[in-house]
């Protein structure tokens, strides 16, 4: 860079810096100053970033051959640490903008504490005469990019835009984490040199996986992302002599970078300034939030306020005009009603003629005949009048009143009943009242008569309708007055918001003017004043003394873990209790009158004794789930590896149904399953045509322009299909010895076709009836893994969530754990256990406590309160090493045993204990009745029957209760609302992440289309997971209600009554079936939004990205609302139907049980028939009750 170029650049950036400060964007002003300082000093920045706890700090210490930086398994570098060659000193930049300097000799441990203090210290610069760094070079250590602390992440991001080379460091066990690929895609285009370091390869176990195979997998992944194998290094700090350690080669590459030419410094600096300017102008326009402009919002909101005012006017008008409108409609109908048509006049004339005094008829004009004829004509005429009134008036009146009730929104069961009952009140006298006596009979008189009669009918109709109109008008006024209040309240709120938006729109316009001015400064020489100080970028920070360091080993706000400290001496002898239940059933089984009850009791005891339990393992891939499962059973049953192994659901259970120990049954997917999975993973819109599965997908590979990874994926499916076609088509199980298991669960070329593997293995754990389910990784790049795992959240009796000691609680865990947090509160008991695996890596107890405190605090952040947290070493447990301070495997086993034997079984055991007591109480009452008089027995019978009637009525009331149904409806609607809110936030974050600058690399339009497809698939997947979470929550809610209603409240009522008992059973096995949800979303729905993306420049440097994200987010929100609206009633119906089934089932069981008990009492009250049996049962119950039969909890 020439002096003249440097001077011009410094003038422009100096003016920009001034504008940034005036616009209160100190953050980007500082970045701009840092960029120009680096350019002026002609310094090379080499940054180290990657996963937190991947060993970045340890690696830097090793490269510098000195213990400079603090190291820990949890995030330690809470700020930026810059290491330079120079006179020995430390410079601290505080978060409040000051600067402190420690010159000369300093304490390393004190400096390391400053490196951990992210609250007070923003960055630390360390200078010394390091032989491993050239002058003009800075090594930069950053917090982990996947740290759960947003401040850590921002700290890392703030320096990366300045780096000349970036070394991305990952832990050996977490190479395939999805965030690796996402980060590399987002950063590789903005930094000249990107490298990938796989650290801690000392964790490699050659007996599990050959290192060459592992290396090939890593190289393939990087190659897919455009990073060459020359940029890949494998390192180990703890084992320098490790055969695969490339620390020496890494040092050589660092030396080469340090000596690289600085000829492209100006171009890189200008690009960095331009990026900062773009960010600043977006900040001015508030585009970072993706919100629409305030001018647009103002326009929309002005219309909204006017609409509310119109609604208010209309409502008030409706209140005053409802009755008038109804009356007008009724008058219109009656006016138009042809009540006395021409056809009627002949009957009218005949009737009028008969009313003449001179009217006579019959032989010799007898009076009887004349009266008979008059009645005949009167009745005929009135019948016709009544029919025509009904047809011409009543029916139309009813229809109109119905329509009016709907128009005015008062169509209720009450109003509908009132309207439907409307009839014009007609009496036969009405036709006589219209007669004008004395008038001469003529055709003109007949016409006038019919007109008068019609008017009388209309008056009657109006009078009858007036009562209905009065009721409807009152209903309208009541409803509208509520609407008016609601509209008024909203109008006040929206009017206030309108004032706010008017002010914001004004500010937004100012921001637009500022933006134009800033770009003019950068692009037009004449727009930049030339009196700017060329050393403006030099630090103007206030010099202060080094801040006081905070005391204590940790600033984490960990929650206490009381559940992990439960004393084991409280363990319950449940097996002894079960034996005692059997003893009681044997004793009472000899009493014929109690045979039905004791048989049912014995069957329930047997179900409790033989109950099966499911223990599910969750966690991110490579968290050690398979190793933990192996440690639980005591042998390497499942394969384990540093790359994701569990691509299927794997179960370990005791041998049953003739299956041999140490064998496995493999269940394959169907052709439809395979097709659906390929479509989902590749994004191919529809199933290709073809005569066979193989033909279809071979054609698809040739016809579609697929990405290389998708071609490989389909190839894997085709290989697996070809090899196991018979098993797939015929759905036959494949039985194999354990020695042949690995390909079916760990190699995608086979495992992709496997649905489930059941391993039969005899050990103490499986003999207790426990089945271990090892699920796919919760944060694996393969979405199929997590989708398969989710169903076990609901079904498992208990589950363990695994996290890795040196990489605990990464961002990949967050979404899954947040759903566990949502589910946890709905469970009737806490069945979640959290495991920190590989705790043998702990240096000492202090470090271990730091990690457990950190994990506990992070779990609490995600809604998992009071987590049951343990640290283990599956590796050491498997080889039989004695338990140490870090390996709590024996405690895990004890807690698991207690949970299964006490927490899970205690509800059933308590019910059985209560039922046993009630059986004894029945015997005691029957025994007492044997010594009562006939009168006393009769009185006892009457009390029994009254109690039976009360209890049966109570059961019916509970069975038909609507209260819980309304609660279910309310809770479902409320949860769906929150799901929509969460998905809106998720969409915003997802789209910002999906549409990154890396898309400019290659075919822009193709990359954008792919990004959209991927984002839509992820959004769809998140929606489905949210609905599944809702299913689990509602299942727990319903189960808890049934338990409270039938086990607690009803049982208490029965105990107070004294005659009857009801065994409700275990509701967990009756859980709700997860609802299948298959919403559809297509990329073509967003064609218009994609068309608006003109070019990378327009998208990233102008307002394109923010506008696009907001447009897509809003459309996704509407689509989601439509999904939810479509699902809402279906879900409510699904849940309420399940609840009604449970209530009905409970009611039937209860009625049957109390009926049996009533019959037993009645037989016992019979004179002397069962006296001997009752006496024997009585003595046996006395003996049983006197022994200790209490369940110890």
Swiss-Prot record:
Residues 774-777 are annotated as: G3 motif D2. Gene3D superfamilies: P-loop containing nucleotide triphosphate hydrolases. Requires Mg(2+) for membrane fusion. GO terms for biological process: cell septum assembly; regulation of cell shape. Residues 619-626 are annotated as: G1 motif D2. It is found in: Cell membrane. Disruption phenotype: No visible phenotype. 5% of cells have a double septa, 2% of cells are very long. Double dynA-ezrA mutants have longer cells with more double septa than either deletion alone. Double dynA-floT deletions are highly elongated, filamentous and have strong defects in cell shape; cells grow very slowly with an extended lag phase. Double dynA-mreB deletions have strong cell shape defects. Double dynA-floT deletions are less motile than single floT deletions. Increased lipid mobility in the cell membrane. Homodimer in solution. Both D1 and D2 domains interact with YwpG, YneK interacts only with D1 while RNase Y (rny) only interacts with whole protein. Probably oligomerizes at damaged membrane sites. PANTHER family: SARCALUMENIN, TRANSMEMBRANE GTPASE FZO1. Belongs to the TRAFAC class dynamin-like GTPase superfamily. Dynamin/Fzo/YdjA family. This is Dynamin-like protein A. The gene is dynA.
């Amino acid at each position: 860079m020439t002096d003249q170029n440097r001077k011009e650049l410094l003038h422009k950036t100096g003016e920009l810096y001034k504008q940034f400060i005036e616009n209160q964007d100190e953050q980007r002003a500082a970045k701009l100053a840092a960029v120009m300082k680096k350019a002026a000093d002609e310094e090379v920045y080499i940054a180290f970033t990657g996963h937190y706890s991947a060993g970045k700090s340890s690696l830097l210490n090793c490269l510098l051959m000195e213990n400079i930086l603090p190291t820990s398994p949890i995030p330690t570098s809470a700020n930026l640490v810059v290491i330079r060659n120079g006179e020995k000193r430390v410079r601290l930049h505080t978060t409040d903008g000051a600067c402190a300097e420690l010159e000369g000799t300093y304490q390393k441990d004190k400096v390391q504490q400053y490196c951990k203090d992210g609250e007070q210290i923003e960055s630390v610069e360390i200078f010394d005469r390091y032989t491993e760094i050239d002058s003009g070079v800075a090594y930069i250590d950053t917090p982990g990019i996947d740290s759960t602390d947003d401040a850590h992440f921002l700290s890392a991001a703030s320096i990366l835009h300045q780096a000349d080379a970036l070394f991305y460091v990952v832990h050996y066990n977490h190479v395939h984490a999805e965030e690796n690929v996402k980060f590399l895609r987002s950063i590789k285009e903005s930094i000249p040199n990107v490298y990938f370091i796989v650290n801690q390869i000392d964790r490699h176990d050659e007996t599990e996986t050959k290192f060459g195979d592992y290396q090939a997998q890593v190289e393939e992944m990087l190659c897919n992302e455009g990073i060459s194998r020359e940029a890949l290094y494998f390192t180990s700090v703890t084992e320098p002599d490790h055969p695969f350690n490339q620390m020496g080669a890494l040092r050589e590459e660092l030396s080469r970078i340090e000596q690289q030419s600085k000829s492209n410094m100006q171009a890189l600096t200008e690009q960095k300034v331009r990026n900062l300017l773009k960010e600043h102008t977006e900040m001015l326009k508030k585009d970072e939030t993706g919100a629409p402009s305030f001018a647009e919002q103002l326009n929309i909101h002005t219309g909204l306020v006017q609409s509310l005012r119109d609604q208010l006017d209309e409502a008030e008008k409706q209140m005053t005009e409802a009755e008038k409108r109804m009356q007008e409609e009724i008058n219109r109908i009656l006016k138009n009603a042809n009540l006395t048509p021409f056809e009627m006049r002949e009957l009218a004339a005949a009737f009028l003629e008969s009313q003449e005094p001179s009217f006579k008829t019959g032989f010799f004009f007898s009076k009887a005949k004349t009266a008979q004829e008059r009645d005949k004509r009167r009745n005929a005429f009135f019948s016709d009048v009544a029919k025509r009134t009904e047809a011409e008036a009543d029916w139309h009146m009813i229809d109109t009143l119905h329509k009016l009730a709907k128009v005015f929104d008062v169509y209720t069961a009450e109003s509908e009943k009132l309207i439907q009952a409307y009839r014009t009140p007609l009496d036969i006298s009405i036709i006589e009242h219209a007669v004008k006596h004395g008038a001469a009979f003529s055709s003109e008189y007949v016409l006038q008569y019919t007109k008068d009669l019609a008017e009388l009918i209309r008056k009657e109709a109006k009078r009858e309708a007036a009562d209905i109109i009065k009721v409807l008008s009152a209903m309208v006024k009541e409803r509208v007055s509520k609407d008016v209040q609601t509209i008024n309240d909203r109008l006040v709120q929206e009017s206030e918001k309108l004032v706010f938006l008017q002010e914001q729109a004004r500010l937004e316009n100012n921001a637009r003017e500022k933006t134009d001015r800033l770009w003019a400064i950068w692009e037009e020489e004449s727009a930049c004043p030339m009196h700017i100080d060329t050393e403006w970028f030099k630090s103007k920070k206030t010099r202060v003394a080094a801040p006081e360091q905070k005391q204590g080993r940790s600033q984490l706000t960990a929650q206490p873990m009381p559940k992990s400290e439960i004393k084991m001496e409280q363990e319950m002898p449940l097996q002894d209790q079960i034996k005692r239940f059997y003893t009681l059933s044997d004793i009472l089984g000899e009493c014929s009158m109690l045979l039905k009850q004791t048989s049912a009791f014995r069957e329930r005891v047997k179900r409790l004794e033989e109950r099966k339990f499911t223990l599910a393992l969750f966690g991110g891939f490579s968290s050690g789930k398979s190793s933990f499962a192996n440690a639980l059973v005591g042998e390497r049953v499942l394969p384990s590896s540093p790359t994701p192994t569990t691509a299927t659901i794997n179960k370990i259970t005791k041998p049953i149904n003739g299956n041999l120990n140490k064998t496995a049954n493999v269940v394959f997917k169907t052709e439809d399953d395979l097709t659906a999975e390929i479509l989902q993973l590749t994004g191919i819109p529809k199933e290709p045509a073809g005569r066979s599965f193989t033909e279809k997908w071979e054609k698809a590979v040739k016809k579609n322009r697929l990405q290389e990874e998708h071609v490989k994926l389909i190839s894997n499916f085709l290989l697996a299909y070809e090899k196991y076609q018979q098993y797939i088509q015929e759905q036959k199980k494949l039985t194999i010895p354990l020695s042949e298991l690995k390909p079916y669960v760990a190699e995608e070329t086979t495992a992709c076709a496997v649905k489930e593997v059941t391993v039969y293995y005899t050990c103490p754990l499986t003999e207790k009836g426990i089945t271990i389910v090892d699920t796919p990784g919760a944060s694996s790049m393969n979405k199929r893994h997590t989708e398969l795992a989710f169903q076990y959240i609901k079904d498992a009796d208990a589950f363990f969530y695994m996290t890795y000691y040196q990489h605990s609680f990464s961002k990949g865990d967050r979404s899954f754990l947040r759903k566990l947090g949502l589910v946890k509160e709905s469970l009737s008991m806490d069945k979640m256990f959290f495991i920190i695996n590989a705790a043998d890596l702990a240096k000492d107890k202090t470090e271990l406590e730091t990690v457990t405190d950190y994990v506990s605090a992070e779990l609490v952040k995600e809604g998992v309160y009071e987590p049951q947290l343990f640290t283990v070493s599956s590796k050491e447990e498997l080889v039989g090493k004695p338990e140490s301070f870090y390996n709590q495997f024996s405690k895990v086993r004890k807690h698991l045993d207690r949970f299964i034997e006490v927490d899970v079984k205690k509800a059933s055991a308590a019910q059985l204990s209560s039922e046993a007591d009630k059986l004894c109480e029945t015997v005691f009452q029957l025994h007492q009745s044997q010594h009562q008089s006939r009168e006393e027995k009769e009185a006892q019978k009457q009390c029994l029957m009254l109690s039976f009637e009360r209890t049966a009525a109570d059961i019916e009331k509970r069975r038909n209760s609507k209260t819980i149904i309304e609660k279910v409806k309310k809770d479902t609607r409320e949860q769906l609302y929150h799901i929509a809110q969460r998905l809106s936030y998720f969409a915003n974050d997802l789209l910002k992440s999906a549409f990154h600058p890396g898309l400019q690399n290659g075919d822009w339009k193709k990359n954008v289309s792919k990004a959209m497809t991927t984002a839509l698939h992820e959004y769809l997947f998140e929606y489905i997971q949210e609905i599944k979470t809702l299913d689990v929550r509602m299942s727990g809610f319903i189960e808890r209600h049934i338990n409270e209603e039938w086990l607690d409240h009803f049982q208490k009522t029965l105990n107070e009554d004294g005659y009857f008992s009801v065994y409700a059973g275990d509701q967990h096995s009756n859980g709700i079936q997860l609802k299948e949800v298959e919403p559809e979303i297509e990329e073509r729905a967003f064609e218009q939004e994609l068309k608006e993306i003109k070019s990378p420049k327009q998208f990233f440097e102008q307002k394109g990205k923010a506008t696009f994200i907001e447009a897509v987010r809003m459309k996704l929100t509407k689509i989601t609302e439509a999904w939810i609206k479509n699902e809402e009633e279906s879900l409510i119906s699904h849940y309420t139907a399940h609840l009604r089934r449970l209530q009905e089932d409970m009611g039937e069981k209860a009625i049957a049980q109390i009926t049996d008990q009533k019959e037993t009492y009645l037989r016992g009250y019979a004179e002397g028939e069962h006296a001997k049996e009752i006496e024997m049962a009585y003595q046996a119950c006395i003996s049983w009750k006197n022994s200790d039969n209490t369940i110890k909890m």
